[in-house]
């Protein structure tokens, strides 16, 4: 009733323990006098007191409510400021963004997802002012994907929204049997570009005791030309699925069980993809976000095989890097280069969540991840989720994170200055590749291990810090000959398909350069000894010891003691051997480095017209180890915290060993892009109309004069950087050098 008030309600225990903003919903309950209608508007006074009796009032505001409820955003500590309504705080955020000029423009070709705007289905009656403010905030940040009924006419005219094929829909809740009818009934079908099949999905499951699964397994084996005896069974009624508990007793059955589970799920997704393509036509891509947690391991079956078999057509992942003790946001490049390999044949566009979460991430690491994603092939921007806390309690950017909100706006508008080249362009192919082995992945998983993925990442970082461009190739690429033009192959694994090992042997004989770490492919896909590569390495015998299963660059690894030390010509000191040691008895190989006990640590062998190097430990891990301080892992939101620490003090002797094949192949002087600071992640993205060189600075500091040399630029009409205003440009025939200041990220845009 008018004039009445509620009792005091204690809220202090619910305030955020970190002192951050959060929302509180106030619902006004009132009794309408008999015979009267409820009013459209209700005037209420909301008071906050420092005591339970209301004697020490610290805030009092009067509001006219449209409906019965409203939301306050309240600080974790009222000494830091007063509470605000959503309208007030949106007005404040808009003012902060408008006071921050941006030189870029909203993208029109590349979709931008994951930014707030439009309708909101929260626990309140959303009034027009709130929705208008929310929508303009999203527009100012660069959101360019809107349904036709989401935009206010004044905002649509002011921001000139593209009306192209940019919409995304999610059909995870639509069964395959009903998917076609569902798609036919959609409005705006012609505007859809992305169809999501789910979030953080997995493939490869099967039920050991399921009669239908085992029956499908039999049909799968028959289609592959296999009989029960090939897998160690007597008759078909004895053939069955096998999991990790029997993997090492029944290795052939286990290997084919894993392939069956993966391919079974791929075909389910492929069926949905075919329906989408039938109804929505060309230019529409299917995908589902893949989580790389917790080892940032792009497992071959899901991350590569699925797309090579067209289960889906848009490789898609997320960073969440600040949650995992990875080396740095440069792991983004590793993930995307694997996804780029997955979609290589059809040039599938990559979709990547670059996450601005605050608290959690920082503007620096957001910028690094964003620019590394662009450099390695990302074509769909998704911030999941650049929204305030009232939208999610897990994925959000807090109101007070002004620098993060600015970074989101800047990054989005940076892309608008180069999107025509990025969308139609491709990362320039490399003559150097890392070989992915599905066989190694399957047997690593059987042991509960991810250690070869750990070393593979470390070899990747080493080569990228040597400014070597990298592609990833597969066992299938070796078998079908599509990897034949690769000059240098790096292999980090234990197992290889026998057919792939034979092709790798022939590739070396024909002039290829092979570099392998401890393991080297002496086991086949059935976990059986294999000597196909022994003459390639020039090895008479070998045995392998691996001491760890799971490590992270910033957790556990920095306290690890070396198993031994070894010498190498030109190294300033002896190098440590971490995690793995392979005892090698050379036959024709030359011993280049020895362990303290005199045994071979690095061998090199001429085989036919090619050359093979085998390092009997993990040299990539030796490269990163001195750069990681012995600090406890944290999840802080400060660039000073260990979660956001950028390592720089790497072992240059280890890099020398790993990068030596690049020099021997004559590639060191013809790298497509080189920068004066090797810790800048840079690639060449090329289209018929120009080149984009995306730069991500992992040197842990501002670079006042970075010189970037780009090969084979061709005819040049204009050169700009999307951020740096001061450029020095020099031509050297077909090549170009650009000198510019670099903080964390930038793009050089060369138009032809």
Located regions from the model:
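Mature N-terminal, pre-catalytic/accessory segment of carbohydrate-active enzymes
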Residues: 1-162, 166, 175-197, 230-235, ...
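Polysaccharide-binding and catalytic clefts of secreted carbohydrate-active enzymes
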Residues: 84-92, 96, 100, 178-342
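Aromatic-Pro/Gly-enriched surface loop or interdomain linker
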Residues: 93, 98-106, 401-485, 518, ...
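The substrate-binding groove and active-site-proximal loops of carbohydrate-active enzymes
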Residues: 110, 114-119, 163-175, 247-266, ...
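Alpha-helical scaffolding within the catalytic cores
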Residues: 125-126, 150-155, 177-182, 294-306, ...
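Catalytic-core region of carbohydrate-active enzymes that cleave or remodel glycosidic bonds
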Residues: 272-285, 302-388, 495, 594-598, ...
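Aromatic/acidic polysaccharide-binding cleft in carbohydrate-active enzymes
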Residues: 315-322, 351-406, 429-449, 520-521, ...
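A conserved amphipathic helix/loop scaffold
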Residues: 492-752
């Amino acid at each position: 009733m008018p004039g009445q008030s509620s009792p005091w309600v204690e809220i202090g225990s619910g305030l955020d323990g970190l002192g951050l903003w959060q929302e509180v919903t106030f619902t006004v309950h009132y009794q309408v006098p008999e015979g009267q209608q409820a009013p459209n508007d209700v005037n209420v006074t909301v008071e906050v007191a420092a005591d339970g009796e209301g004697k020490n009032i610290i805030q009092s505001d009067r509001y006219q409510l449209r409906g019965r409820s409203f939301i306050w955003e309240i600080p974790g500590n009222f000494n830091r400021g007063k509470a605000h309504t959503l309208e007030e705080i949106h007005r404040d955020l808009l003012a902060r963004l408008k006071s921050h000029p941006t030189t870029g423009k909203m993208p029109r070709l590349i979709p931008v997802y994951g930014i707030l705007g439009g309708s909101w289905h929260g626990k309140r009656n959303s009034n027009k002012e709130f929705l208008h403010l929310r929508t303009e905030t999203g527009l100012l940040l660069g959101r360019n994907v809107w349904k036709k009924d989401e935009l206010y006419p004044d905002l649509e005219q002011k921001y000139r929204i593209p009306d192209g094929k940019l919409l995304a829909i999610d059909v995870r809740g639509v069964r395959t049997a009903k998917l076609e009818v569902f798609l036919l009934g959609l409005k705006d079908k012609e505007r859809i570009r992305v169809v999501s099949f789910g979030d953080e999905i997995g493939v490869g499951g099967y039920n050991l005791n399921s009669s239908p699964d085992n029956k499908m397994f039999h049909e799968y084996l028959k289609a592959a030309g296999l009989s029960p005896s090939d897998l160690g069974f007597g008759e078909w009624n004895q053939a069955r699925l096998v999991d990790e508990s029997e993997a090492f007793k029944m290795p052939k059955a286990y290997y084919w069980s894993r392939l069956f589970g993966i391919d079974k799920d791929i075909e389910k997704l492929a069926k949905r993809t075919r329906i989408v393509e039938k109804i929505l036509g060309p230019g529409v891509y299917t995908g589902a976000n893949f989580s790389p947690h917790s080892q940032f391991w792009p497992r071959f079956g899901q991350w590569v095989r699925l797309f090579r078999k067209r289960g889906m057509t848009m490789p898609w992942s997320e960073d969440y890097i600040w949650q995992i003790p990875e080396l740095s946001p440069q792991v983004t490049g590793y993930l995307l280069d694997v996804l780029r390999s997955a979609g290589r044949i059809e040039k599938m566009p990559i979709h990547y969540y670059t996450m601005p979460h605050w608290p959690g991430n920082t503007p620096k690491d957001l910028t690094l991840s964003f620019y590394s994603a662009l450099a390695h092939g990302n074509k769909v921007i998704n911030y999941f989720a650049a929204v305030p806390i009232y939208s999610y309690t897990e994925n959000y950017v807090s109101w007070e994170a002004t620098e993060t909100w600015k970074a989101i706006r800047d990054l989005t508008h940076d892309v608008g200055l180069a999107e025509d080249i990025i969308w139609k362009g491709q990362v320039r192919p490399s003559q150097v590749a890392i070989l992915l082995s599905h066989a190694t992945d399957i047997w690593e998983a059987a042991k509960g291990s991810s250690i070869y993925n750990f070393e593979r990442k470390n070899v990747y970082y080493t080569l990228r810090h040597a400014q070597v461009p990298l592609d990833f190739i597969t066992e299938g690429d070796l078998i079908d000959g599509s990897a034949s033009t690769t000059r240098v192959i790096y292999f980090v694994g234990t197992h290889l398909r026998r057919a792939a090992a034979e092709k790798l042997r022939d590739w070396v004989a024909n002039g290829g350069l092979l570099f392998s770490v401890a393991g080297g492919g002496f086991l086949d896909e059935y976990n059986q000894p294999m000597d196909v590569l022994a003459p390639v390495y020039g090895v008479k015998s070998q045995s392998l010891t691996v001491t760890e299963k799971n490590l992270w660059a910033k957790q556990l690894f920095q306290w690890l003691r070396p198993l031994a030390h070894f010498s190498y010509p030109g190294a300033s000191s002896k190098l440590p051997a971490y995690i793995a040691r392979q005892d090698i008895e050379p036959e024709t190989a030359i011993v280049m480095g020895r362990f303290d006990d005199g045994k071979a640590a690095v061998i090199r062998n001429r085989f036919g017209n090619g050359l093979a190097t085998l390092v009997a430990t993990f040299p990539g891990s030796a490269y990163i180890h001195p750069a990681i301080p012995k600090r406890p892992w944290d999840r802080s939101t400060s660039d000073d915290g260990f979660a956001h620490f950028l390592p720089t003090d790497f072992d240059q002797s280890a890099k020398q060993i790993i990068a030596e094949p690049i020099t021997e192949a004559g590639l060191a002087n013809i790298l497509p892009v080189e920068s004066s600071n090797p810790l800048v992640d840079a690639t060449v993205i090329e289209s018929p109309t120009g080149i984009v060189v995306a730069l991500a600075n992992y040197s842990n500091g501002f670079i006042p004069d970075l010189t970037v040399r780009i090969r084979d630029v061709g005819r040049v009409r204009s050169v700009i950087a999307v951020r740096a205003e001061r450029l020095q440009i020099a031509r050297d025939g077909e090549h170009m050098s650009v000198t510019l200041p670099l903080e964390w990220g930038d793009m050089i845009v060369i138009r032809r």
